[in-house]
Amino acid sequence: MDWTWRVFCLLAVAPGAHSQVQLVQSGAEVKKPGASVKVSCKASGYTFTSYYMHWVRQAPGQGLEWMGIINPSGGSTSYAQKFQGRVTMTRDTSTSTVYMELSSLRSEDTAVYYCAR
């Protein structure tokens, strides 16, 4: 398990002081192969620009797969090699929202997509 998964798992179970933090994602979508999808994640309850945001996904019957990370402050990104050229992560500081766009969709992209602080 690499550090990104340790961070993700820690955030998933951390109780107490951060219970006011909310990440609200856009709803489910159905897309055809070759299309693109853009998922939003609106943050609240903390200083948006102070924490990096990860995107992960979980395909049916599979484990979590890390896709990439964005720095909401400067907008810099780092993507998993598997998604290079197909994924774009952006942010809008005025609405405390991050976005993940995945293009050239394939059947194997069927998954639940999550943002994680």
Swiss-Prot record:
For this protein, the record's Pfam families field holds: V-set
Specify the Ig-like domain's residue ranges: 20-117
Q: How does it assemble?
A: Immunoglobulins are composed of two identical heavy chains and two identical light chains; disulfide-linked.
Per its record, how is this protein called by name?
A: Immunoglobulin heavy variable 1-46
Q: Which GO terms describe its molecular function?
A: antigen binding
Cross-referenced InterPro entries, in alphabetical order?
Ig-like_dom (IPR007110), Ig-like_dom_sf (IPR036179), Ig-like_fold (IPR013783), Ig_V-set (IPR013106), IgHV (IPR050199)
Complementarity-determining-1, as annotated region: 45-52
Where is this chain primarily localised? secreted
Subcellular localization is given as: Secreted; Cell membrane
Q: What happens on changing T49N?
A: In IMGT allele IGHV1-46*02
The protein's matches in SMART domains, at most eight in alphabetical order, are given as: IGv
Q: Where is this region: Framework-1?
A: 20-44
Which organism is this protein's natural source?
Answer: Homo sapiens (Human)
Sorted alphabetically, the Gene Ontology cellular component annotations on this record are:
extracellular region; immunoglobulin complex; plasma membrane
- PROSITE patterns, per database record: IG_LIKE (PS50835)
Q: Cystine bridges: which residues?
A: C41-C115
Function according to Swiss-Prot or TrEMBL: V region of the variable domain of immunoglobulin heavy chains that participates in the antigen recognition. Immunoglobulins, also known as antibodies, are membrane-bound or secreted glycoproteins produced by B lymphocytes. In the recognition phase of humoral immunity, the membrane-bound immunoglobulins serve as receptors which, upon binding of a specific antigen, trigger the clonal expansion and differentiation of B lymphocytes into immunoglobulins-secreting plasma cells.
Its Gene Ontology biological processes? immune response; immunoglobulin mediated immune response
- Position of the signal peptide: 1-19
**Does the keyword Transferase belong to this entry?**
no
